[in-house]
């Protein structure tokens, strides 16, 4: 599954951000809500891990809102991280990029926050359960996990009403 996901995102990396704005309902609210859930003050220093960071859209918003935050971006697709590097170039040494399958790779240190946007839903349910258990191992005491993602309703009728 990881190979198929990597291949699809590698092929679409250059168009991903434009498509995301069209495909994600309430795009601005979606990302702003994830940002606002971070329990830090604007001047706080903290370490953040972005799982499935893609082109770095959420991380760039976080870096701008929290100029003392240090960010690590994990993504499976080098082409997506190339775009993230360009986007986050102004952030300088506060950001680190790791090409890795976040479902299998473990970070080398604990983080004050772990975030993910539109990535974890690609995993099967068993993979999600395993990842969620691992994420709590990655967090410092009192750390937070924010998953901004798509979810399926209990049945097709509920999904249809949500659209």
Feature names for model-found ranges:
Residues 1-15:
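N-terminal, positively charged/glycine-rich alpha-helical extensions of SAM-dependent methyltransferases
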Residues 49, 55-104:
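Class I SAM-dependent methyltransferase SAM/SAH-binding core
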Residues 106-114:
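A short acidic, Gly/Pro-enriched loop at the edge of an enzyme's catalytic core
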Residues 129-141:
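A short glycine-rich, Lys/Arg-flanked "PGG" loop and its adjoining helix->strand segment in the class I
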């Amino acid at each position: 599954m990881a190979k198929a996901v990597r291949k699809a995102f590698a092929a679409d990396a250059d168009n991903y951000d434009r498509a995301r704005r069209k495909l994600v309902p309430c795009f601005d609210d979606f990302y702003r809500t994830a940002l606002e859930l971070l329990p830090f003050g604007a001047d706080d220093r903290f370490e953040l891990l972005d799982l499935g960071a893609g082109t770095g859209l959420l991380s760039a918003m976080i870096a701008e809102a929290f100029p003392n935050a240090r960010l690590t971006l994990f993504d499976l697709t080098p082409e997506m991280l190339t775009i993230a590097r360009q986007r986050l170039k102004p952030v300088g040494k506060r950001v680190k990029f790791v090409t890795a399958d976040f479902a299998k790779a473990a970070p080398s240190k604990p983080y004050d926050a772990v975030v993910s946007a539109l990535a974890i839903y690609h995993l099967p349910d068993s993979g999600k359960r395993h990842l969620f258990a691992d994420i709590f191992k990655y967090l410092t005491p009192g750390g937070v996990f924010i998953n901004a993602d798509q979810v399926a309703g209990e049945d097709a009728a509920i999904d249809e009403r949500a659209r």
